[in-house]
Amino acid sequence: MELVTGGELFDRIVAKGSYTEKDASHLIRQVLHAVSFMHENGVVHRDLKPENLLYYNQDEDSKIMVSDFGLSKTEDSGVMETACGTPGYVAPEVLQQKPYGKAVDVWSIGVIAYILLCGYPPFYDESDANLFAQIIKGEYEFDAPYWDQISDSGKEDEFFLLHAHFSISLRTCST
């Protein structure tokens, strides 16, 4: 275990508002690398969110570390069906109480990437029932002016993370 002193990604998002595509891509690559390592070792986090991504130190270019494995599960412990995670970051199949696997972490990374790029979550409602319905339907927008500066390829990458997570392995998207 290591002591990390750089604070949460959440706090940096609040301070910055949003990230450039280049900076967001750098952060997401780090998260994908860490999660790929976890998945290769049979661990599914199940609660990835900016509050659980910590900066190693205060440096602007500090590496990101994954924390809070309280809801994580090993794949060899059986089929995962437990509804768990943080509401805005949880994958549709979890909400639908279907069996799930590693792809739920990819979904959460897609939500985090969306927030990094525009400063707000793709799914939001005061009512959990309405929020969950949005997530299950995949209802989100690339609202102007927040997404005006994001390239088409950036939007395509975001779409890929939020829609293709069901049938992909993390290895295919860790570029």
Predicted regions and their residues:
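Conserved short submotifs of the Hanks-type protein kinase catalytic core
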Residues: 2-8, 12
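Conserved catalytic-loop aspartate of Hanks-type protein kinases
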Residues: 105
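Structural helix C-cap motif within protein kinase domains
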Residues: 118-121
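Catalytic-loop of the protein kinase fold
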Residues: 39-56
